[in-house]
Amino acid sequence: MATTAVPAGGLKKIRVMVVDDSMVARGLIIRGLSAHPRIEIVGYAINTLDARNKIPQYKPDVITMDVEMPGQSGLDFLRQYLPTNPLPVILVSSLNLKVFDALAVGAVDFVRKPDDQQSTDAFIAALAQKVIIASNARPRPAAASAAGGGQTAPGAIPKLGPSASLDRVIIGLGASTGGTEATLAVMKRLPADIPPMVIVQHMPPGFTKMYAERLNRLCAMEVREAQSGDELKRGLALVAPADLQCRVVRIGTRYTVNCTPGEKVSGHRPSVDAMFHSMADVVTCRMVGIIMTGMGQDGAHGLVEMRKKGAYTIGQDKESSVVYGMPGVAQNIGAVMIQASCDNVSNVLLRHLKSLG
């Protein structure tokens, strides 16, 4: 087989294999990604058995895969294949809860299939961006699986108990690529009376509500998708809705969230930076900022501002990050007070909260 072409810019093209049983979907993805100067389509497969046979031949850097296919599903394929063959896989799916199961067993990211012609260009642009990110990612199927089990049952986690100091704490957490399971790994280890949390996870429309519901089922605290006006209170975590900026605001003695369709910040909506900057403006409360795995630098500069205002800041370390972009930039610019592995972020957070009395 011919060697992978090198574009004029000197960067080696990313070898992509498309796995989808739909001829229409395959054609759309192949045509769209082939037009990108950084991407080369090296082959396709019509189902997971076909993919298993062709991967050694095509040697892809990244695979795009539908979740629902006849015969063995994409989810079952990932469960069986990724533990011994950790390839970056991007899911291409309609609105489906199985996406989160696939992320739990090691898929790197996902893109929602377009539902009309108008959204096709945006779909291809998003998929191409995620392919480029995934080519530098480190899939963690074993870690992802561990995040879903083997931990203390939510009801068995000791509560923090009454505390006037903790009543004045607000926790912000931001993540992107690899963050759905990293965030779950943190939150499953936190008690039911945790101070209020606001979570920004880059995610397509339709999925943030399902993600919040999943966290709510698996964690001790209440978790739901945020709505403007929701009051921040202990035992409640709010997930920023897709395509809206989510900011913390003060109204008298209360703290609420404001979710608006504003401009993108740091290239994202919702943006971790927008959320962190709003928290930095709320200087009358004790703040904690946590930045997790993700490509780019969204959240890094907002976390700097939080630290300047006296917040306690935590960054996920390189070894446990699927993509050490956001936490890496935050670390490099001095935004992070302490780095921790994904499995230890909750311990670091709880030690800090207990120190506040």
List each language-model region with its residue ranges:
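Conserved acid/base catalytic micro-environments in cytosolic active-site loops
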Residues: 1-17, 22-34, 38, 44-64, ...
